[in-house]
Amino acid sequence: MEARDCDVIGLQEVRCRPADLPEGAFGDRHVSWAPGSLAGRNGVALLTRTAPAEVRSWGTHLVMAPGQAPTPAQALTGNTDGLPTELLPFADEGRYIEVDLADTPLTVACLYLPKGATPDPANEKTIAKQDRKMAFLTGFRDHLVRRRQECTTQGRHFLVMGDFNIAHENADLKNWKANQRNEGFLPEERQWFDTILSPDTLIDVVRAQHPDTNGPYSWWSWRGKAFVNDAGWRIDYHLASPELAS
């Protein structure tokens, strides 16, 4: 973090409970954190150099100054006004938080999209899990449209980054031919990605800058030698409004 010297850092799967976060864990960064209600799971956070002008999340969240330890008294209530119906069951899971930066007209969102399962007709649980993911995708597409349009009206750029649990294109997955029927690379998931990207709405920044590059991958299976062989998936993205992307 010190070497990169980033203005904003997005974290997903911040699985610890607020009480377990060491004091001063993020140094001189301001922390906006939606831990979620599921112990040991999910959680998203944004780290910024300066205090954000506004912080929004669907569920309970914390806003901490540098070196400040989280306490229950700091918990802020989330806002689900206007949230698509499909997203309401996810509101308290620690999957989305966004900040308005105070020193530049930019809204940054951090996302941890639910993981589904490869549907198996003989296993109802896999079908239900994938249906749940697809419901999130339906609602989140509408949410993205709304937030992007609101930011445009306010004269703000918009960026959503995080773990989408989907490889969009063949270049985003090393063994794409063998995974065409697997969750994370299913046709309906990839088609959903097509619907949220366009030159006039949101742009996949990495792919725009590196159109002919495989990857860069951001996740590797712990099985076998996937990491050693760089047999990975690109499931983490920065999607930016056109002016910001350029």
Can you describe what each PLM-predicted range is?
Residues 50-246:
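Active-site regions of metal-assisted phosphoester/phosphodiester hydrolases
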